[in-house]
């Protein structure tokens, strides 16, 4: 038995991954990556079988953000040519939900740019979510930024199932990425969402000049935060942002990152998120041996893979899509 299978068996028996072992996953020799992914798959299979959760993003508000996040094309310091608009209307949010439902996508993610939502914007989301729940029954994830007192409770009451607010990077690396809010601001928002009864979703962006130790710290921080869902983004550097031209990733390293997050967060939903197409490239399918969830369609300001291609990929792997009906049943358990 190889070292990765031994580690997987220990994790499945309730054991922890040490700091040294976590770093060794990221430093796995390229020739051994298939062995590593096979071991990660044993953990993934225990908790999720061969099911894949599908998620779709609605970019409900674009640009116009006062924050200075170095990776983001919507930030105040970005010169990227993007569409900027205020919160879309209810009809547009409902049309997006219908499209998700028709494509058998169980989770609909309403995402808005900005530091955090105004109470009026929360009103708009609340109004739309109530009708989406009644009409389509989708799982709703909201990603609206830092929350003010009372906003999380209103979203929960309206039917929002999950709230996303990514930590993005390690606490050590945070000030290299943004200075307009703190790492603790992000953690506190996830805790606020959790206290309201919404399922906490928080993830990372890998490839922002962080060290391997930073990546290990991210995975362990999300374990401590007890995030139910962990989106793992890989930097898609956009022209006009401070991280323009940064390209530190390769497909094999991205697979190692996904394996690390599965080993450290064995029971959690690990989602391959933004940047998978440009960073994993032809190795995208292998990522699902560690992860059990993907975004389908476009991201916020970058294009994703065609939905048909995603379904073909899952079929070719012998994996099964978690249907809308299965997702509804899971919400009732």
From Swiss-Prot:
GO MF annotation: an example: biotin synthase activity
Domain Radical SAM core: 47-276
Entry EC number(s): 2.8.1.6
GO biological process entries: biotin biosynthetic process
Residues binding [4Fe-4S] cluster, per UniProt: 65, 69, 72
Binding site for [2Fe-2S] cluster: 109, 141, 201, 271
Nucleotide-binding keyword on record: no
The protein, known as: Biotin synthase
Organism this protein belongs to: Bacillus licheniformis (strain ATCC 14580 / DSM 13 / JCM 2505 / CCUG 7422 / NBRC 12200 / NCIMB 9375 / NCTC 10341 / NRRL NRS-1264 / Gibson 46)
């Amino acid at each position: 038995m190889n070292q990765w299978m031994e580690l997987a068996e220990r994790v499945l028996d309730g054991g922890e991954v040490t700091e040294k072992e976590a770093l060794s996953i990221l430093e796995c020799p390229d020739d051994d990556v298939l062995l590593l992914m096979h071991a990660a798959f044993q953990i993934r299979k225990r908790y999720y079988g061969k099911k894949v959760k599908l998620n779709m993003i609605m970019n409900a508000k674009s640009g116009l953000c006062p924050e200075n996040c170095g990776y983001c094309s919507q930030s105040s310091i970005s010169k990227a040519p993007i569409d900027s608009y205020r919160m879309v209307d209810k009809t547009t949010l409902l049309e997006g939900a219908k499209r998700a439902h028709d494509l058998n996508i169980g989770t609909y993610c309403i995402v808005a740019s900005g530091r955090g939502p105004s109470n009026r914007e929360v009103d708009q989301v609340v109004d739309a979510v109530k009708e989406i729940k009644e009409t389509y029954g989708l799982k709703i994830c909201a990603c609206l930024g830092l929350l003010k007192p009372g906003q999380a409770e209103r979203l929960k009451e309206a039917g929002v199932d999950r709230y996303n607010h990514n930590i993005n990077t390690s606490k050590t690396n945070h000030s290299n990425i943004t200075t307009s809010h703190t790492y603790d601001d992000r953690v506190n928002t996830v805790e606020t969402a959790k206290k309201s009864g919404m399922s906490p979703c928080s993830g990372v962006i890998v490839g922002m000049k962080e060290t391997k130790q930073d990546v290990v710290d991210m995975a362990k921080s999300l374990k401590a935060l007890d995030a139910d869902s962990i989106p793992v983004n890989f930097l898609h550097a956009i022209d006009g942002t401070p991280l323009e031209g940064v390209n530190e990733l390769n497909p094999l390293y991205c697979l190692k990152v996904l394996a690390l997050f599965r080993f450290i967060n064995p029971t959690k939903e690990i989602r391959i998120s933004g940047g998978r197409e440009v960073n994993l490239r032809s190795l995208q399918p292998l990522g699902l041996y560690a992860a059990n969830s993907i975004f389908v369609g476009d991201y916020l300001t970058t294009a994703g893979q065609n939905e048909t291609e995603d379904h073909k990929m899952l079929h070719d792997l012998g994996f099964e899509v978690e249907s809308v009906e299965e997702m509804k049943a899971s919400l009732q358990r």
